[in-house]
């Protein structure tokens, strides 16, 4: 017999489905834009594609699994653990992609003349592969033993049951809060976020310094070159800010769970924190569309070429290679 779904659960599922319906097409559009526009082929946009792939997976995989967990099916412990781990992998991948983007923007303003020889497509691909491999290691650590199996088994055996425990599948029931706080948050989330803040502060400082000094750059026009870098840096810093705003509340709630087990956490706050984490995957394409000219033009061209019912002359015959507005 299928589990009973309350009105509150139905509302939760509806919101999650809405987020997925925005996130998946939006991030597929980002990947599509990079594919069709040669001007979006530098290292920064390769890292943005990696971020978009993670966000597509959130909408297509993590949100359906979150809905399944919310319904609360009875599963074996390790089955539930496998359901819980993908979000850890994808979150870590997003953080490392954001860190790679920050380092890339720093190099663009720190060594503009040597940037293209230092940051090659091959090195960017190696960095992306390294980020995903590291994300798999961090996200699958609970599968290697850092989980709540011993606690669950103790209760399971106390009831006279044998074999692998069968539980109501819930994230906190299988994932250790020590892992989430000490390892995931304090090692793999908070330090990279703080490092990225410092990197962007240095990027803004270097750009302002160069604009004031008007030092020549590879473009031959320092105002145009560094003005463009400033705008892109602001847009990418906004992506970082939205990520932190979306994920920190849930990690703070995890800290409360670990350090104050008797403290009550209102269910509405938990759901809001979950919606923020999933909703973050839908935010980035919107930021790109409104803040980065190359993406905006490419999105419109894709729309005009593939989705308009009435043929209309394209707004740009050729996609721009460079725009000062970028």
Swiss-Prot record:
Molecular function GO labels: G protein-coupled adenosine receptor activity; G protein-coupled receptor binding; G-protein beta/gamma-subunit complex binding; heat shock protein binding; heterotrimeric G-protein binding; protein heterodimerization activity; protein-containing complex binding; purine nucleoside binding
Disulfide bond entries: 80-169
Taxonomic superkingdom: Eukaryota
Record lipid sites (S-palmitoyl cysteine): 309
Tissue-by-tissue expression: Widely expressed in brain and spinal cord.
Stated role: Receptor for adenosine. The activity of this receptor is mediated by G proteins which inhibit adenylyl cyclase.
Annotated glycan sites: 148, 159
Pfam families given in the database record: 7tm_1
SMART domains to which the protein is assigned, alphabetical: 7TM_GPCR_Srsx
Residues on Extracellular side: 1-10, 70-80, 147-176, 260-267
Cellular compartment(s): Cell membrane
Protein name in the entry: Adenosine receptor A1
Gene3D superfamilies in the cross-refs: Rhodopsin 7-helix transmembrane proteins
UniProt record similarity statement: Belongs to the G-protein coupled receptor 1 family.
Membrane-spanning residues: 11-33, 47-69, 81-102, 124-146, 177-201, 236-259, 268-292
SUPFAM superfamilies given in the database record: Family A G protein-coupled receptor-like (SSF81321)
């Amino acid at each position: 017999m299928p589990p009973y779904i309350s009105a509150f659960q139905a509302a939760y599922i509806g919101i999650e489905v809405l987020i997925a319906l925005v996130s998946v097409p939006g991030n597929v559009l980002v990947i599509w834009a990079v594919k069709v526009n040669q001007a979006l082929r530098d290292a920064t946009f390769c890292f943005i594609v990696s971020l978009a792939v993670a966000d597509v997976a959130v909408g297509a995989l993590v949100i359906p699994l979150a809905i399944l967990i919310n319904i609360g099916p009875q599963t074996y412990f390790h089955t539930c653990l496998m359901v819980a781990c993908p979000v850890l992998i994808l979150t870590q991948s997003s953080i490392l992609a954001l860190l790679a983007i920050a380092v890339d923007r720093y190099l663009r303003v720190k060594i503009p003349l040597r940037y293209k020889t230092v940051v090659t497509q091959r090195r960017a691909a190696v960095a992306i592969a390294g980020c995903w491999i590291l994300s798999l290691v961090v996200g699958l650590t609970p599968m290697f033993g850092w989980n709540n199996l011993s606690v669950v088994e103790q209760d399971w055996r106390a009831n006279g049951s044998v074999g692998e425990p069968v539980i109501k599948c819930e994230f906190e029931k299988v994932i250790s809060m020590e892992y989430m706080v000490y390892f995931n948050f304090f090692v793999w989330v908070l330090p990279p976020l703080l490092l990225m803040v410092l990197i962007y502060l240095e990027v803004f400082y270097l750009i302002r310094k160069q604009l004031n000094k008007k030092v020549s750059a590879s473009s031959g026009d320092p105002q145009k070159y560094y003005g463009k870098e400033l705008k892109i840096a602001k847009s990418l810093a906004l992506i970082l800010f939205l990520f932190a705003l979306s994920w920190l509340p849930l990690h703070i709630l995890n800290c409360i769970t670990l350090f104050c087990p008797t403290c009550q956490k209102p269910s509405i706050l938990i759901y809001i924190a979950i919606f923020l984490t999933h909703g973050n995957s839908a935010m980035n394409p919107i930021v790109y569309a409104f803040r980065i000219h190359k993406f905006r033009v490419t999105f419109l061209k894709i729309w005009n070429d593939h989705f308009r019912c009435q043929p209309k002359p394209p707004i740009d015959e050729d996609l721009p290679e460079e725009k000062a507005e970028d």
